[in-house]
A protein has these predicted regions:
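Glycan-processing catalytic domains of CAZymes
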Residues: 2-178
Length: 178
């Protein structure tokens, strides 16, 4: 990895809401971190909350999963404590997969509550939220403003070109996103 110029790896960690999936991810990450040269390269976690099954009618508060969301970040602490965990300006980097689907009554308040709990434990976070690849940049902005530190799009290579709106407006979306 160093020879190829890779700065760090991102490892997926699914929510402990599905303990089997969570255990699979933790076993995989821990296995990688036991290799003889694991400390030579940085890593970060990509948090995936999809198994919470959130949607506009089943928000995180209504499903009573706010504490699970916060607990999932606390479960990352053993990794944050590693010297080779990726940081940005001293803050621990966490990438949130499909952050645009974190259905909450108040996303900013949810993130602030989680950040406050981690701060009380001595950890500041730099959170990168993931936005759907074909959406204009200001779509779902209420999920990101005052919540995450940065936003990134999924790769445009994943776009299903058979979708009518994507087929007809792809270039407009691409122009807006860049």
């Amino acid at each position: 990895a160093k020879t190829a110029g890779i700065d760090f790896f991102i490892f997926e960690m699914r929510s402990s809401n599905n303990i089997s999936q969570y255990n699979q991810d933790i076993s995989f990450i821990n296995g990688l971190l036991t290799s003889s040269n694991a400390n030579e390269l940085k890593f970060a976690i990509s948090y995936n909350f999809a198994n919470m099954n959130l949607n506009n009618n089943n928000r995180i508060e209504g499903r009573n999963l706010v504490s699970k969301f916060i607990e999932d970040f606390k479960l990352m602490i053993p990794y944050f404590e590693k010297s080779n965990y990726m940081s940005v300006d001293g803050k621990k980097l966490v990438y949130i997969t499909n952050a645009f689907n974190l259905f909450s009554n108040d996303n900013a308040a949810l993130y602030q509550q989680m950040r406050a709990e981690l701060r009380s434990l001595g950890f500041e976070l730099f959170i990168i939220g993931d936005q759907q690849e074909w959406t204009p940049t200001l779509r779902f902005d209420f999920r990101f403003v005052n919540a995450v530190d940065a936003v990134t799009h999924k790769t445009y290579a994943l776009i299903n070109v058979n979708q009518y709106d994507v087929l007809n407006t792809f270039h407009k979306f691409t122009d807006i996103a860049f």
